[in-house]
Amino acid sequence: MKIVIKLSPEITIKSRAIRIFFIKILITNIKTILKKNNESASIIRNWDYLEVICNHSKYQKICAMLINIPGIHHLLLIKKHMFRSLQDIYEKIILSLNYEIQLSGKSFCVRVKRCGKHNFTSQEVEHYLGNKLCQNIGNIRVNLTKPEKTIYLEIKDNQLFIIIKRYEGLGGFPIGTQQEMLSLISGGFDSAVASYMLIRRGCKVNYCFFNLGGDMHTVEVCRVIYFLWNKFSSSHKIKFISIDFSEVIKEITAKIKDNQIGVVLKRMMIRSASLVANRYKITALITGEVLGQVSSQTLSNLTLIDSVSDHVIFRPLIAYDKEKIIDLARKIGTEILSKSVPEYCGIISKKSTAKTTKQLIEFEENNFDFTVLNRAVSQSYVIDVQNIPDQIINQHVFQVETKKILDSTDVVLDIRTEIEQEKNPLYLNNIEIKKIPFYNLIDQFSKLDPNKIYLLYCDHGIMSRLQVMYLHRQGFSNVKIYRPPR
């Protein structure tokens, strides 16, 4: 058995030189991610697909990594056979997959893709195999529109590929095939999804964060940033730039009229991000703005916001509805994290005008002391996103006891997602384990026995630490972290 990686269709239509360039970058990205996760595999490059050969026990884990790498359209977990005839194909299917059991009492269809020279067509193979299966397996029927079971095959010359399972990938382009960008991220639904969309298009997306709410704001936003990096772009080193905007906010609220604050604040952010982008030779910015979503995002106001920068500003969500954005956030996994991030910009600018003018904005900004803005940018700090847990989250969270050796009275709360719990179950001898995904923990923790000590468990300890922080803020002290000894 092996994994076949099908390239994004947009890669396959490139010229030969560009196609080879993109594939080489994709292979490098795959190898980097496998190495980071202490996995090894052989990658064989073909013209229109890649083959991954690895230990049989690692297939599921490696597939889970590959489906989140930009540039991969889908994965096929396949068995490969040589064949001589259609009867040979039929026997290979029945012998290798026990379809007598899988198809019994169900509707099915056969789908075949074929390339090479043969004396039969793809449709003839489908028809032949369908007939043979119906003749030899009782109580089954063909359904070409909504089958309960679909048998996928690919034929290349005299090779037969039986597709055991198909996994959908991200599509798009491999990271590194496009230029670097700087995302103005607030941690909310919009900026997180906008960042993901440009990552998917092959951009190395760095993050610029304007801290409006202190340490807790930083921690909440860093959860989102680290999640995006860890899931979709850990093949690259990504910068996190944090700018303390508290003094800028004070200056704006003291000097700018209420109805102009929204646009002026956004202009100050774009100015600051442009200075940061110049420092790191980044040519484009990303925002999560949506046309007409709030008063500062009307066409006339966006034009005024753009005018303070020479950089291209990408707004991939410009025509999206909020419902569609949240659906995409849910799909990529940022929805739950973004829910906990307050919208500080909206709190600061509640009465923004929907249509201001250049003259009015410039008149208001004449009252603003730009040394405050320049000082904020000059005092910004930069770290590698992969160091966020150690350099930001752990430093801003009070010390919490971490246990490696458990007592028989301890109760472990497995706070991983249900999918993670199923893929890699936690087994502990004589220890009570409760499965409560982190997104349900806040609501369910108050229902637990307050006289017991609970230890939170996740794969890397990051989510456990964050959840302990939230629980302590709500007054719960009977909670610690469980990190099993390596």
From Swiss-Prot:
Pathway: Cofactor biosynthesis; thiamine diphosphate biosynthesis. The keyword Lyase does not apply. SUPFAM superfamilies: Adenine nucleotide alpha hydrolases-like, Rhodanese/Cell cycle control phosphatase, THUMP domain-like. Signal peptide: none annotated. Coiled coil: none annotated. ATP binds at residues 184-185, 266, 288, 297. It holds the Pfam family ThiI. GO terms for biological process: thiamine biosynthetic process; thiamine diphosphate biosynthetic process; thiazole biosynthetic process; tRNA 4-thiouridine biosynthesis. Residues 60-166 form the THUMP domain. Keywords: ATP-binding, Cytoplasm, Disulfide bond, Nucleotide-binding, Redox-active center, RNA-binding, Thiamine biosynthesis, Transferase, tRNA-binding. Belongs to the ThiI family. This is tRNA sulfurtransferase. It comes from Blochmanniella pennsylvanica (strain BPEN).
